[in-house]
């Protein structure tokens, strides 16, 4: 049995299938962990949802910002953008089934036996793993309830940008969603920045600090696997592994086998515009 990890697919299913074949992934005995953003800029978002859903218990996914945006668009809260290439999902005969399945997926997942956990964007510096699980679960319960439209309608916005245990209601949920699906940089005081998408090496970053480089209030006892940040080009250190290597932007898709740290790479065509 092997455990495979992959970053943002964004509808680039052919690239994922190529990597899984190269790695000799076997659904009946292996696990595939996907760090969110299954859909959006690539050509096969519909087919990607069908494939991952079909893997059933062999696949673990966490929701990304594009996945949440798809749910909002499908429910008429936002209008579809041509560049997101999700119309095929909205028009599909199994659209309702796929969207219901997507809505039931978590924002955060921790492997039960291996020392890693996954969220799409990362974990804010104020939280430990137990808190992350708790706060993510609060949002998941709401998203999976009959009141999910209220959450989808009110999740957009960049504030609050700093965690407080006193946050309640939609402000609490919005911080959690932003931290787990949109965060890249923080300010030195721990406030989230929702705008900058640059590489940390770019001089225009200024005082901003990658979320994983800020001093943490509590040490995380698992390595954090995340996607979302293509400009990192697959950053890895003893604490984190970033697996978005920019497939949709014409760079590559990376599949990591946890047990021996083997990496499988596939050069990709540009799909984002």
Swiss-Prot record:
Q: Does the keyword Hydrolase apply?
A: yes
* Keywords, comma-separated and alphabetical: Hydrolase
E.C. number(s) listed in UniProt: 3.6.1.41
What would be one Pfam family of this protein? Metallophos
Q: Name one GO molecular function term.
A: bis(5'-nucleosyl)-tetraphosphatase (symmetrical) activity
Alphabetical list of InterPro entries matching this protein: ApaH (IPR004617), Calcineurin-like_PHP_ApaH (IPR004843), Metallo-depent_PP-like (IPR029052)
Q: Does the keyword Hydrolase apply?
A: yes
Gene3D superfamilies registered for this protein in UniProt = 3.60.21.10
The reactions it catalyses are: P(1),P(4)-bis(5'-adenosyl) tetraphosphate + H2O = 2 ADP + 2 H(+)
Origin superkingdom: Bacteria
Q: Which family does it belong to?
A: Belongs to the Ap4A hydrolase family.
NCBIfam families given in the database record? apaH, PRK00166.1
Q: What does this protein do?
A: Hydrolyzes diadenosine 5',5'''-P1,P4-tetraphosphate to yield ADP.
The name on file for this protein is: Bis(5'-nucleosyl)-tetraphosphatase, symmetrical
Natural source organism: Photobacterium profundum (strain SS9)
Upper taxonomic classification of the species? Answer: Bacteria, Pseudomonadati, Pseudomonadota, Gammaproteobacteria, Vibrionales
């Amino acid at each position: 049995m092997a455990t495979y990890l992959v970053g943002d697919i964004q509808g680039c299913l052919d690239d994922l299938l190529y990597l899984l074949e190269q790695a000799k992934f076997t659904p009946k005995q292996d696990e595939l962990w996907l760090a969110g953003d299954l859909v959006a800029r690539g050509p096969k978002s519909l087919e990607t949802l069908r494939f991952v859903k079909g893997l059933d218990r062999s696949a673990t996914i966490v929701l990304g910002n594009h996945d949440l945006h798809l749910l909002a668009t499908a429910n008429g809260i936002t209008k579809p953008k041509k560049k997101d290439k999700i119309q095929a999902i909205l028009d599909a005969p199994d659209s309702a089934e796929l969207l219901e399945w997507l809505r039931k997926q978590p924002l955060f997942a921790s492997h039960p036996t291996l020392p890693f956990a996954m969220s799409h964007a990362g974990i804010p510096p104020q939280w430990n793993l137990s808190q992350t699980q708790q706060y993510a679960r609060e949002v998941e319960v709401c998203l999976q309830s009959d009141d999910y439209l209220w959450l989808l309608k009110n999740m957009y916005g960049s504030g609050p940008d700093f965690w407080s245990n006193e946050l309640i209601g939609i402000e609490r949920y919005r911080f959690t969603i932003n931290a787990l699906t949109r965060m890249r940089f923080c300010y030195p005081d721990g406030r989230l920045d929702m705008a900058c998408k640059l590489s940390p090496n770019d001089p225009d970053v200024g005082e901003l600090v990658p979320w994983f480089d800020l001093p943490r209030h509590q040490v995380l006892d698992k390595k954090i696997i995340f996607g979302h940040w293509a400009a990192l080009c697959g950053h890895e250190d003893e604490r984190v592994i970033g697996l978005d290597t920019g497939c949709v932007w014409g760079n590559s898709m990376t599949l990591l086998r946890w047990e021996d740290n083997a990496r499988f790479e596939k050069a990709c065509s540009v799909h984002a515009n």
